[in-house]
Amino acid sequence: DVYKRQREEGSGTRDAFTELTGILVKDGDNKTDNTTASAVTINSTEAVITNVKDNDAAIGYISLGSLNDTVKALKIGGVEATADNVKSGDYAVSRPFNIAYKGELSDVAQDFVDYIMSSDGQKIVSDNGYVTVSENAAYSGKKPSGKISVAGSTSVSPVMEKLAEAYQKVNTNAKVEIQTSDSSAGMQSAMGGTCDIGMASRDLKDEEKSALKVETIAKDGIAVIVNNANTCDDLTLDQVKSIYTGETTVWSDIIK
């Protein structure tokens, strides 16, 4: 059997994955997620990796930047899941990493955003397997002091932690605190003012866009992962959809 692993509702990775694969069907304002009820819900990127690593018939989907060699990423339509293929547009399953905030940022939070978008910040983005989005010059901020609270996506969190670590070395007056939940919770926190900056691994929804300012800090693929022992190497988007909607239930239907 194919053991399907999915992310929770509120996960930006789930929102982007279901939309890009056609599992999510839109009819006007109505959206229907046709993921089969037999898919097991898992609440973080790391937990999906662990679950697929420990189950030789499992399939899951994660942030490409979080991929490691304990699991295998499948090609999609013959195209490998790599940052280069995301950048060129050849890899079909990709999405933005967004940060969002309400109104004007504090001096120190704005300085941190300037750092992320600088060539220094974008080097960290690409060094960690994500796709850069800005051609800005090197960071030359005033290094204001203060605290910055960042909250949201488990996909964005790993690169945000690296960015925060590097920024705090450059600006020793700043303290960046990161709380990881999911994209929707991050946007709610930003709208409610309980964090300075929210993180989302998807496009913002209309109600979020109307309340928040948004900036894309990186692009990321969504890797479809299986156990290293699985002999399947390549699926089409339609095959991925057919697994997650419950039409395809056994690997032998795919692996001939």
Q: Could you say what each language-model-derived stretch is?
A:
Residues 1-256:
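Exported/periplasmic ABC-transporter solute-binding proteins
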